[in-house]
Amino acid sequence: MKYFICLTLAVLVSACQSPAIDALSVPLNTLHQNSDIAGKVAKPIRHKGQDYWLLTSEKLGVLLTDQNGKKLSSTDGNIELLDWRDNIQLNGETFGLIAALDSNLGQVLIIKLDWQTLELSEITRLPKTSAQIESLCWYLMPQGHLSLFTADTLGEVAQRTVVDGSQQQLTDLLIQTFIGTPQTKSCVVDDTLGYLYLAEENIGVWRYLASHESELSRELVIATDPNGPVMGEITHLDILPSGELLVTAPEQKGVWIVDTQNNNQAQFVILEGSHKPESVSAVMQQQSIRLGVFDDETGQYNASALNRDSKPLQTTTSSMQAVTAYAETTPVNAYGDAADDPAIWINFADSGNSRVLGTNKKQGLLQYDLQGQLLKEFNVGRVNNVDVRYGMKFNGKRMDIATASNRSTKSISVFTIEPKTGELAFLSDIKTDIDDVYGLCMYQNAEQYYVFINGTDGHYQQYLLKPNGDDISGLLVREFSAPSQPEGCVVDDQNQQLYYGEEAVGVWQVSAEPIDAKSELIIKTNEIFVADVEGLSIYRYKGQRFLIASSQGNDSYGVFALDDKNKHLGSFKIDMDITTRVDGASETDGLAVTSYPLGAQLPQGLLVVQDGRNRLPTAPQNFKLVDGLQLQGLLQSWLEKL
């Protein structure tokens, strides 16, 4: 038997050509008749060289048997679906954990397998859902947490953390929800590569990135007829250590093995003697693959073996370190690309009452306290970037100033800040002739206050702010251009240097003074510092300056030693913190940082970043707040290696 595959990584091409693939054939051996068990999954498992089976049963719950099918332990319940992960740490002990759907209760049960006693026992239940769950699958996250994906009859996929890997304790924390596929028959996660696979029964198998911080996108891995080789519906998925995907095809009386690392090439395995295989599960057994097959027509559990060496994937472990946020701001008021750029205003009279400003480019400027609570909002238009400076002589007194690039009015929106209270007030707009204003930052040289503003076409303008009675006007004093689209920028006032990002290229440096000066490209994007370059800010530590830049292409933040030839010290990510229930940050646009002590709680300052994908649970965008102490820890570890 030969099958012709015309599948590429993400696109079905009707005119493609591909070599014929010979089908393998393996015999089945009866493990159990369904008359006494009545279930749908036979999961082969292996622990310390010993082979076992996990069976689902409508009458007996979950059964653990030896390799010959002899019952060792069981639980109560009407169970049809399960998934399994071994070597999970709970309270200092190691267990196997089973997620099983009880059809009578309509709930997911979490069951542990104690390897010392070979006993199964239920340890918790997840909350009931409004729609019936159709499939479930474990995901062992890179942080060590164990989470579970479920897909329901409405097509909603939910991910929730079940085991806190850092505390080795059970938890129940909804991470994210999204609309997956209708009629999701099965799901499985490749923990090593971080892929979630969903089987849409009459369409094919879709692949998603499993990380909750990843962009929600999908690609078709293997399709049903007429667009692919699978005849009829797909009923079950499993994954091999090699990353190969097992796709059960009942009408073809077999299973497809899809090489997800090799252009999704597929090989078909005929299950000899089967009538309608509903599920095919697998485990590595030395140089072969042990298969567990449930046949829906005969009601039999069957066992088989495939002589195939499925070597575990060899992956490069990322050396990127991570920090966590201690708090997050109130989400903006609508979904979509809205939150963009933060700024930190320091209350020098009472630093613990400093403020965070944030732009909502669908609404205006927002003001938060240091715990992220929304204090005030100004509906002044689609403001994009914001910055602050201190002590301007204005209207007979000293006031702090915030400015923001306003895309609605093609202007610089000016705000005053009362130095002792943080009271924020909108003042006026300074018109520009930039067609599509974008990024903005400020520069202060003694009593001279400047604003740099750019457009999406790369054009930069520098304005001198001029107090004028009870208003502030702007005088255009300089213009220059970046080669392509910029956005984020920051000025080192003390050294009179402007740093600005060219999103696809890197970071440029030029004099901040209103003179004709040549820009120099000092930092280039690479495989670690990945475009787009977005937010920029400067952190000071032990008398040195460090530029922090958001690397939107891989959801990270690059740190560069400005006083050491702009050396890239390293990059870091912001991960979720289950204890505080604050998620990490991804797809970051703007950021702001200070090393100035902000009260007793933040003696080493603060980092604020925009979060493009707000999770725990899924919500509109917001900003994440990171204790500067964590930044100092990273810097110290990097500097010690120099």
Stretch-by-stretch model annotation:
Residues 1-7:
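Sec-dependent signal peptide recognition
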Residues 17-642:
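Sequence/structural signature of beta-propeller domains
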Residues 13-15:
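C-terminal motif of bacterial Sec signal peptides marking the signal peptidase cleavage site
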